[in-house]
Structures are given as structure tokens and as C-alpha cells.
Amino acid sequence: MSVLQKITERVRPNPANLPVVLELDLARGVLTHAPTSPIEALKQRTATTLRDIREGLAHAEKDDHVVGLAVHIGTAPLPLGDADEVAELIAAFTKPTIAWTETFGELSGHSSAYRIACAADEIWLQPTGTVGFSGFHASMTLFRGTLEKVGVTPHFEQRKEYKSAAETFGGREISDANREQTQRLVDSLLEHAIGDVASARNLDEDTVRGLVDQSPIGAEQALEAGLIDHVGYRDEVYTAMRERWGTERRTRGDDRSGEARHAIHPSYVNRYNQRAQTTGRLSRMFATDRPAIGVVSAIGNIVLGPSTPGVGGTPCGCDTLSAQLRSARHDDSVQAVVLRVDSGGGSAVGSDQVRREVLQLREAGKPVIASMGNVAASGGYFIAMGADRIVANPSTITGSIGVLGGKFILAGLHERIGLVREGADAGARAGMWSEREFTDDELDVLNAWLDEVYSDFTTKAAQDRGMPIDELEPLARGRVWTGADAAERGLVDHVGGLATALRVAAEHAGAKPGELAIRTLPQMPWLDQLRPPESSETHASAVGWDLGPDGLFRAAARMLGMEAPAGVLSLPWTPHIRS
């Protein structure tokens, strides 16, 4: 190949104008949201994001060169909500799709991966692979025995019986209420998965449930049962795609016989989307006032103050998130806002602050649609509940309308390691949050405050959801729900992913599909993001960077694991759900 040919191939990736087959390799992982810093952006520049998939497939629908989509499932685990998102996008793609993989788990469960494959028109499985569509398992760890061994005594109060973080640290076994909600979570996940598989594979639900209990199932048995369409290796998958979708070409350089072969041009979805976006980037630079749906993300623990990045991730600082929502309110080009929530909650005060900004957006005449990701619980639900509509994935963990508070008593630990801590208090309750046990007065204060926060949470939730408080109360009590169950009970409005939320936002803005641009907020050059904002009302205040000495010190403290608890509106426990 000449130097000129090599340069041409770089500039024009498909010089022969072959049919394009998009490749989505889930084994390489999928990012759910855009990087929050320039450094993260550099490290993740080759990764595929949900936005790449959504925008790339949307562009491919209108591109006559694109003839199909090949999805490599692989074994990389995706969170259940992300798996819902990917499956929804694949199912909505109207051109032919093939899903292939080496195995759906190797003698282990991989139910979420198989559900994604079922969104494709056709499924291929390696001969030695298995279908591990075996259901869902949830587990939680109780630390009471371990804490006792080191002399730590947990003291937590909760509202109410389902807000079960207290037993995570103080229980020797899970409560009946916790066992009930955990069992319902996995049952709901399996019910939805069975329904999806039965519909996609044209099977009876009872038949699918029976196959779940037989998993893992070998390739030939899976083929016979109708769970897959073909048994074959990767090369056989790509040979089949070339024969179906390729253009016949006479080969010479690598095949001296000069026989005719079918050829395609594979392209990763993220690379295809980047090229498609580049072609319109210049025009968009001069059309920033184009009517748009603004997407604002609330990712991570909700904390007071800014979203200061750290090695362990970037929390959802309520000051930063509030500024982003204000920026959208003041931007005349933003016709509607999608608030993307992936948070287990945190600060009650911060959550209420964000909810206020959501309500002000609505008062300004701009519809707000909440889109729930993997988790939108407790404080994560609080910031979403004031939206015009709430959209949740069927596997989203949401609800947890409740409150908890407490501390760890460290006197026993100090005694065991020979540590002496002395102090002085100026004020009757100045030492309430020190390492000692609560006094009776302090415990009364804590419980009164938890009652007040719980009442505020449930009252506002009932108001936002338009239901009487006595109807909402049984759905609250700290209980978590899947998105599917929450929709049946009126806690969310629609079951679907971000693509569904964007469609609902366009409808509420009175726009036709595709009429509004999709803009991730804040949309600013990296250099501007590094500059300090002029005030809390300026666009730059929506970034959340703090590169001063205090900000760097807080980041260093977070690196050393010295971060404060997220807050009283936190998800009570984080179940480890394995599929």
C-alpha cells in the first residue's frame, strides 16, 4: 500500500465505499455518562458511552451505507439499569442486528447479558458456550460480629422498618421487612426478564421459567429450546454477515485466484458516532442557540457544596447541580430539561435544595423529565420526584422514601488499642456527634429530627406525585422498589431509559421527534471550566471544579478515605445483585 493510500485511509476510513456494519463491543465496557474532568476524558477517549450508542444508531438509521449492527456481548458485567438502556437502544434500531458471544457466563449466571442479546434479531453462541439465564441473586453483608471484634458499637435510628442500614452494621440477621423487600426485588427482576425473553424469543413464559431453573444450558440444548438461533464461532458470524450484507468484490492482492468474495466495512459505534458528530460540529459551533433539550446529570452521593472530583469519583454536589439547573432555566435555547439521576441519595438539605431548582424550572415554563439510571433512591428519588414526569428502567432501584441517622461508638476500639481521647464541650449538645454514646437528651433530639425529615419527605412526595399521603405512606417507609414495581404503584410514570425520557421531554415541549437538539449541560470549553466563576449566577458556576488549596486538600482527604458520610437520605443498604 502506498503512502498516499495510507493517508487516504486515515482521512476516509471507508475508501472503497463498502457496506458499513456497526460493531458494539460490550466486552469493552460502556460508560453511562460523560467524563467529569479533562483528565478523565483523556483516559476514556476510546470508550463507548450510552450517548455514543444512542446518537450513533440514530444517525445510522438515516445512513444508507449502514446495513446492520453486530453486538459482541462478551462477559463484562453491566449494571442492571445500564443493561436495560442498551437493550432498549438495540431493540429500537430498525436495521438488522446480530448478537454474538463466546458464552453467557461460564457455568455461572449472566442473565442481564442474555437479555441484551434478546434485543437483537439473531443470537449466535460459540459451541462450547452456555446460556446462563439463571435468575438473580441478592446478598448483603452484616458487620456486627466484625465490629464487635474491634470494639466498635454502631448506633443508628431509622424511619421506617424498611430503611435497614442499621442492621447492616448492628444486626446479626436481616429483619423480616428487609427480607421481604429483598425477595421482592429479585422476584421483580426475574419477572421482567422472563417477560422480555419470552416476547423476544416467541416462547411461553412458563417455558422460559422452566429454562431458568435448568440453567446453565449448553449451546446445542439452547438452540433446540429456541434460546439462540445459531451455534458458531466469531469467524462464522462475520462470514455470515459478509454473505448477507456485503458487496461482492474480486480480490487480487491477498487471493491469487481472483475469486469473488463479499466484503463489508466494520466500524465501532463510538468511532462512527464521533465521525458523524465531527461533520456537523462546525455548524453547531455557530448555532448554540438552536432549540434543545438540556440533559443535566446527578451522579453519585448527594453532598452539600460543589462537585469536587477525587480519586474515588466525583460526588453530586448540590451547589453544582443547582447551578446547572439554574443555567438551563436562564438559557432561552433550552426548551426542556432531562434530569438524569444515578444516585443512592445523601444529604437531606442538599436534596431539598435541588428539588427547589427543579420546581423553579417548571414554574419558568420549562418541562423537567427525570430519567432514572441504575439507582435513584432516597435522596436520589427526592430530587427526581418534583419533575413533570419520571422515567425509570425496569431494573432501576428506586424509592427508599425514608431516613436514617446515627454514628459509631468508638470507645471500645480506643480502649483496645490503647488510645485515649479527651475533650471539652461548650454547649449541652456540643459533643453529640463525638465517638461516645448518645445521651438520652441527644437521642430524643435525633429521633425528633428524623421524624421531622421523614414527614417532610413523605409530604412532598405525596404532593409531587399527586396522591393522598395515606396512599403514599405504605409505599414509603424506607422501602426500595424496582422501576417496574414503582411504575405499577405510581412512584414513576414511564418504564424506559434515557431515550424514552428524551422522547417524553420533546412531547412536553410541544416538539416533533428530532426537532430539538440534545445538549449535555453544562456545555463549556475545558479552559472555561478551569476558570473560577464570577458569581453563583454565571454559567461557570455549574462546573464544580475547585483547584484552590482547600479544594485540593479535600480531594486528598477523599483519596485517604476520610470522606464524611453521604447523609441521612442515603440508600439504606447496597444489595449486591448478581445475574
Label every model-predicted segment.
Residues 125, 228-234, 391-392, 492-498:
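Short acidic-hydrophobic, aromatic-tinged amphipathic segments that line or gate anion-handling sites
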Residues 67-68, 122, 230, 335-336, ...:
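Residues at the N-termini of beta-strands
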Residues 72-211, 216, 343-481, 502, ...:
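Conserved catalytic cores of soluble enzyme domains
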Residues 1-63, 72-74, 137-219, 224-333, ...:
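Intrinsically disordered, low-complexity segments enriched in small/flexible residues
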Residues 296, 339, 384:
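Conserved hydrophobic/aromatic pocket- or pore-lining residues that grip, position, or stack substrates
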Residues 60-67, 94-95:
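Short, solvent-exposed loop/edge-beta patches enriched in aromatic
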Residues 486:
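Cys/His-coordinated zinc-finger cores
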